[in-house]
Amino acid sequence: MRLLPLVAAATAAFLVVACSSPTPPRGVTVVNNFDAKRYLGTWYEIARFDHRFERGLEKVTATYSLRDDGGLNVINKGYNPDRGMWQQSEGKAYFTGAPTRAALKVSFFGPFYGGYNVIALDREYRHALVCGPDRDYLWILSRTPTISDEVKQEMLAVATREGFDVSKFIWVQQPGS
Protein backbone atom coordinates (compact mmCIF):
# COMPACT_ATOMS: atom_id res chain seq x y z
CA MET A 1 0.00 0.00 0.00
CA ARG A 2 2.96 2.33 0.46
CA LEU A 3 3.56 2.01 -3.27
CA LEU A 4 0.31 3.80 -4.19
CA PRO A 5 1.40 7.28 -2.96
CA LEU A 6 4.72 6.85 -4.78
CA VAL A 7 2.99 5.89 -8.04
CA ALA A 8 0.56 8.80 -7.67
CA ALA A 9 3.42 11.25 -7.07
CA ALA A 10 5.40 9.90 -10.03
CA THR A 11 2.33 10.14 -12.27
CA ALA A 12 1.64 13.71 -11.16
CA ALA A 13 5.28 14.68 -11.79
CA PHE A 14 5.16 13.10 -15.25
CA LEU A 15 1.96 14.98 -16.10
CA VAL A 16 3.43 18.30 -14.99
CA VAL A 17 6.52 17.77 -17.15
CA ALA A 18 4.64 16.33 -20.13
CA CYS A 19 1.96 19.00 -20.14
CA SER A 20 4.13 21.99 -19.41
CA SER A 21 6.61 22.11 -22.27
CA PRO A 22 5.96 25.39 -24.04
CA THR A 23 8.89 25.08 -26.41
CA PRO A 24 8.84 23.94 -30.03
CA PRO A 25 10.39 20.58 -30.87
CA ARG A 26 14.17 20.55 -31.23
CA GLY A 27 15.20 21.85 -34.65
CA VAL A 28 11.79 23.33 -35.52
CA THR A 29 11.75 27.00 -36.50
CA VAL A 30 8.83 29.21 -35.46
CA VAL A 31 7.55 32.22 -37.37
CA ASN A 32 9.24 35.52 -36.54
CA ASN A 33 7.74 38.97 -37.18
CA PHE A 34 4.43 37.51 -35.96
CA ASP A 35 1.47 39.88 -35.60
CA ALA A 36 -0.97 38.45 -33.05
CA LYS A 37 -3.71 40.91 -34.00
CA ARG A 38 -3.69 39.60 -37.57
CA TYR A 39 -3.87 36.02 -36.24
CA LEU A 40 -7.05 36.71 -34.24
CA GLY A 41 -10.40 35.38 -35.39
CA THR A 42 -11.57 31.98 -36.58
CA TRP A 43 -9.42 29.31 -38.21
CA TYR A 44 -10.67 26.05 -39.72
CA GLU A 45 -8.78 22.88 -38.94
CA ILE A 46 -7.92 21.33 -42.31
CA ALA A 47 -5.76 18.48 -41.03
CA ARG A 48 -4.30 17.23 -37.76
CA PHE A 49 -2.31 14.43 -36.25
CA ASP A 50 -4.67 12.18 -34.31
CA HIS A 51 -4.88 12.68 -30.55
CA ARG A 52 -7.45 11.77 -27.94
CA PHE A 53 -8.81 15.25 -27.23
CA GLU A 54 -10.05 15.73 -30.82
CA ARG A 55 -10.59 12.13 -31.84
CA GLY A 56 -13.56 11.74 -34.19
CA LEU A 57 -14.37 15.45 -34.38
CA GLU A 58 -15.39 17.11 -37.65
CA LYS A 59 -15.96 20.76 -38.60
CA VAL A 60 -13.30 21.81 -36.11
CA THR A 61 -12.51 25.50 -35.65
CA ALA A 62 -10.23 27.49 -33.38
CA THR A 63 -11.13 31.08 -32.53
CA TYR A 64 -8.63 33.48 -30.98
CA SER A 65 -9.29 36.80 -29.25
CA LEU A 66 -7.25 39.14 -27.07
CA ARG A 67 -7.32 38.85 -23.29
CA ASP A 68 -7.10 41.83 -20.97
CA ASP A 69 -3.85 40.44 -19.53
CA GLY A 70 -2.10 40.43 -22.92
CA GLY A 71 -2.68 36.77 -23.67
CA LEU A 72 -5.12 35.16 -26.07
CA ASN A 73 -8.45 33.48 -25.45
CA VAL A 74 -8.77 30.20 -27.36
CA ILE A 75 -12.09 28.53 -28.18
CA ASN A 76 -11.85 25.17 -29.95
CA LYS A 77 -15.08 23.76 -31.29
CA GLY A 78 -15.86 20.57 -33.20
CA TYR A 79 -18.79 18.40 -34.15
CA ASN A 80 -18.92 14.84 -32.81
CA PRO A 81 -21.00 12.84 -35.34
CA ASP A 82 -21.14 9.77 -33.07
CA ARG A 83 -22.85 11.79 -30.34
CA GLY A 84 -24.67 14.14 -32.71
CA MET A 85 -23.45 17.17 -30.79
CA TRP A 86 -20.95 20.02 -30.75
CA GLN A 87 -18.06 19.94 -28.30
CA GLN A 88 -16.20 23.04 -27.17
CA SER A 89 -13.18 23.75 -25.01
CA GLU A 90 -11.92 27.12 -23.84
CA GLY A 91 -8.34 27.93 -23.03
CA LYS A 92 -5.78 30.67 -22.78
CA ALA A 93 -2.44 31.22 -24.46
CA TYR A 94 0.58 33.38 -23.68
CA PHE A 95 3.76 34.13 -25.59
CA THR A 96 6.81 32.35 -24.21
CA GLY A 97 9.04 35.23 -25.25
CA ALA A 98 8.68 38.24 -27.52
CA PRO A 99 5.17 38.60 -28.98
CA THR A 100 6.72 38.88 -32.44
CA ARG A 101 7.87 35.25 -32.18
CA ALA A 102 5.03 32.76 -32.75
CA ALA A 103 5.91 30.50 -29.81
CA LEU A 104 3.15 30.31 -27.22
CA LYS A 105 2.08 28.17 -24.33
CA VAL A 106 -1.57 27.17 -24.21
CA SER A 107 -3.71 25.73 -21.43
CA PHE A 108 -7.13 24.14 -21.51
CA PHE A 109 -6.75 22.63 -18.05
CA GLY A 110 -5.70 24.68 -15.05
CA PRO A 111 -1.99 25.27 -14.58
CA PHE A 112 -0.91 22.78 -17.27
CA TYR A 113 0.52 24.34 -20.44
CA GLY A 114 1.67 22.85 -23.71
CA GLY A 115 3.43 24.35 -26.68
CA TYR A 116 1.59 26.11 -29.50
CA ASN A 117 4.07 27.02 -32.21
CA VAL A 118 3.23 28.57 -35.57
CA ILE A 119 5.89 27.19 -37.92
CA ALA A 120 4.48 28.37 -41.26
CA LEU A 121 2.21 31.29 -42.08
CA ASP A 122 1.47 33.00 -45.37
CA ARG A 123 1.82 36.78 -45.63
CA GLU A 124 -1.94 37.33 -45.67
CA TYR A 125 -2.50 35.20 -42.52
CA ARG A 126 -4.80 32.82 -44.43
CA HIS A 127 -2.99 29.51 -43.83
CA ALA A 128 -0.93 28.30 -40.89
CA LEU A 129 1.00 25.23 -39.86
CA VAL A 130 1.05 24.78 -36.07
CA CYS A 131 2.87 22.23 -33.93
CA GLY A 132 2.84 21.35 -30.28
CA PRO A 133 5.80 20.69 -27.98
CA ASP A 134 6.93 17.64 -29.96
CA ARG A 135 6.47 16.04 -33.36
CA ASP A 136 3.31 14.19 -32.27
CA TYR A 137 1.13 17.31 -32.61
CA LEU A 138 0.62 19.12 -35.91
CA TRP A 139 -2.24 21.04 -37.50
CA ILE A 140 -2.93 22.74 -40.82
CA LEU A 141 -5.25 25.72 -40.29
CA SER A 142 -7.01 27.97 -42.78
CA ARG A 143 -9.32 30.97 -42.71
CA THR A 144 -11.60 29.02 -45.06
CA PRO A 145 -13.00 25.47 -44.71
CA THR A 146 -10.99 24.24 -47.71
CA ILE A 147 -7.54 24.87 -49.18
CA SER A 148 -6.15 24.56 -52.67
CA ASP A 149 -3.94 21.63 -53.60
CA GLU A 150 -1.08 24.12 -54.03
CA VAL A 151 -1.41 25.33 -50.41
CA LYS A 152 -1.76 21.74 -49.21
CA GLN A 153 1.48 20.75 -50.95
CA GLU A 154 3.29 23.80 -49.54
CA MET A 155 2.22 22.93 -45.99
CA LEU A 156 3.17 19.28 -46.44
CA ALA A 157 6.60 20.33 -47.75
CA VAL A 158 7.24 22.58 -44.74
CA ALA A 159 6.10 19.88 -42.32
CA THR A 160 8.34 17.30 -43.98
CA ARG A 161 11.31 19.69 -43.97
CA GLU A 162 10.75 20.29 -40.22
CA GLY A 163 10.87 16.54 -39.56
CA PHE A 164 7.17 15.67 -39.22
CA ASP A 165 5.73 12.42 -40.60
CA VAL A 166 2.97 13.83 -42.82
CA SER A 167 1.48 10.37 -43.37
CA LYS A 168 0.01 10.79 -39.86
CA PHE A 169 -2.30 13.60 -40.99
CA ILE A 170 -6.05 13.11 -40.65
CA TRP A 171 -7.94 15.31 -43.10
CA VAL A 172 -10.82 16.93 -41.24
CA GLN A 173 -14.33 17.02 -42.67
CA GLN A 174 -15.33 20.65 -43.12
CA PRO A 175 -18.31 22.23 -44.89
CA GLY A 176 -17.58 22.04 -48.61
CA SER A 177 -14.70 19.58 -48.26
Swiss-Prot record:
Underlying gene: blc
Record-linked InterPro entries: Calycin, Lipocalin_ApoD, Lipocalin_bac, Lipocalin_Blc-like_dom, Lipocalin_CS, Lipocln_cytosolic_FA-bd_dom
Gene3D superfamilies: 2.40.128.20
Gene induction: By starvation and high osmolarity.
Residues covalently joined to lipid (N-palmitoyl cysteine): 19
Keyword line: Cell outer membrane, Lipid-binding, Lipoprotein, Membrane, Palmitate, Signal
The protein's name in its UniProt record: Outer membrane lipoprotein Blc
Lipidation (S-diacylglycerol cysteine): 19
Organism, as annotated: Escherichia coli (strain K12)
Major place of residence: membrane
GO cellular component: cell outer membrane
